[in-house]
Each structure stands twice: as structure tokens, then as C-alpha cells.
Amino acid sequence: MAVNPLDFLKNMSSVKSNIDNIKKEMSKITVCGKAGSNIVTIEMDGEFNVKKVSINKEFFDDLDNDAFEQMVKSALNDAVSKVKEEIKLKTMGVLPFGM
């Protein structure tokens, strides 16, 4: 079966429009990664930019350096996972298979 080049171009235009819409939706995403019962929280946007890091000072004095570094790493990884999940949910069914 032959592919009509005009149909292909129409589909590409639709894909570009979908990608533009996804980019807009991604810019609206904000998640909060947490670690250590909220001792460390990291706010991240849909483009994986860290917007805010919060440390509960009440517990900070009791932490050693290794524990604190582990909590920051865990909170950051939690935020990244949440952004990926939001992107997955927002793009489900929007992009053609394989993109």
C-alpha cells in the first residue's frame, strides 16, 4: 500500500501540534520530592529544574553529613520520578506509538 505524501504531511503537522501542547503542559507541572519524613523537600518543574529546596531546621542539627546528603539525594530522585510520571500521564495517547 502506497503512502500519500500529503497525508504524511498532515499527520506531521498534527504531531507538531501535539508536541507543542505537551511542552505547554510540561511547563505547568510542579512536583515536590520528599525525604526523611519531610525533613528535605525539593520542588521541581516539568523541565526538571529545581525551583526550591527546603530543609526542616528542627531536625537539621541532629543529622550527620552523610545522612543529610542521602536525604537530599532521595528527595531529588523522588522529584525526578514524579516529574517523569506526570509527563507519562500527560503524553499518554497524544504521541504516535514509538515517539
UniProtKB/Swiss-Prot annotation:
Listed InterPro entries: YbaB-like_sf, YbaB/EbfC
Gene3D superfamilies, sorted: Nucleoid-associated protein YbaB-like domain (3.30.1310.10)
UniProtKB keywords: Cytoplasm, DNA-binding
Disulfide bonds: none
Regions crossing the membrane: none
Gene Ontology CC: one annotated term: cytoplasm
Domain of life assignment: Bacteria
Localization terms from the record: Cytoplasm, Nucleoid
Primary localisation category: cytoplasm
Subunit structure: Homodimer.
Function, as annotated: Binds to DNA and alters its conformation. May be involved in regulation of gene expression, nucleoid organization and DNA protection.
Protein name per the record: Nucleoid-associated protein EbfC
Lineage per the UniProt record: Bacteria, Pseudomonadati, Spirochaetota, Spirochaetia, Spirochaetales
Name of the coding gene: ebfC
